[in-house]
Amino acid sequence: MVGGHAEELNFNLESPHKWSFEWGWNNESYSKSDIHFKGIDHQFTLHGVRATDTQKTLTPLSLFNTYLNPGKITIPQTNARIAYQINSDTAFALNLDHMKYVVSDSQTVSASGQYLQKNYQNSDKQYLSPAFMHYEHTDGLNVVSLEYEKKYPINHLPGNLKMQFFALLGAGIVIPKSNVTMTMLGQVRNDKFHLAGTNLDVAGGLEFDFSKEYFARTSYKVGRVHLSDVVTSARQDKASQKFNYQEASLTFGLRF
């Protein structure tokens, strides 16, 4: 009986559960970025622009009001992932990182180029505020990636604890819904989903197995986004930018 009980508890990943689904949340930090704007009456660049994410602080109230509220499913920064386990240590996955990117108001940056009758000279500065412009991807800096993952079991853990280290490579596309208000041009925002660029990333983390079916993962990711075709107004003005990011995430998953 003792041996049979031990065998029952000694689950591992050599099981018929080939597919898995995860859902969770993320936090980001972003590098500074040069943002290039172009349209029929403007062509200018804002240099070294700072941006942040918008994840809400986790409190008992926000946990149930925001994070676990089905009616506000897109308000937090979320992760969704479906993976196929080829064998015990290799998987392919389709991953969605629903991140948010907001250019910080009340910062002063260098500017070059021109808009309407305004010409920036060498070393001119521009104060960023809603009276000038507001720029964000908050209905999603949505990164859809294909991932290749390897797992490495961590041995000699106490009791029945099962833990693995994983590392992955990801590449994909970025489909933001950019909320850009070009106040100084009198233009309203486009406010539509649009294929705007590409993403490359690498990540690593720990996977905790509660059973054959249920698990949790913590991960740290670094990536680079190249947005070559951001739509900034209803008349289809454009912007482009590149930036690096770091992401920490917590997800919960089910194998099936």
Show the residue positions of the predicted features.
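Short glycine/proline- and aromatic-enriched beta-strand/turn motifs that initiate or cap beta-hairpins
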Residues: H5-Y84, P176-S178, S249, G253-R255
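Short loop/turn motifs that connect adjacent beta-strands in outer-membrane beta-barrel proteins
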Residues: E7-K18, S88-D89, P153-F165, F210-A216
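Residues that define the transmembrane beta-barrel architecture of outer-membrane proteins
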Residues: H17, T74-T78, T138-V144, M163, ...
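Predominantly the C-terminal beta-signal and adjacent terminal strand-loop region
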Residues: S33-H36, F44-T45, G205-F256
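Outer-membrane beta-barrel translocator domains and adjoining extracellular loop/strand segments
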Residues: D34-I40, D105-A111, K177-Q187, D229-R235
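Flexible, solvent-exposed coil segments and beta strand-coil junctions
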Residues: Q55-L63, Q121-P130, N179-Q187, S228-S233
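Extracellular loop and loop/strand-boundary signature of outer-membrane beta-barrel proteins
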Residues: N65-L68, P130-H137, M184-F193, S233-Q241
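Gram-negative (and chloroplast) outer-membrane scaffold detector with strong preference
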Residues: R81-T181, G253
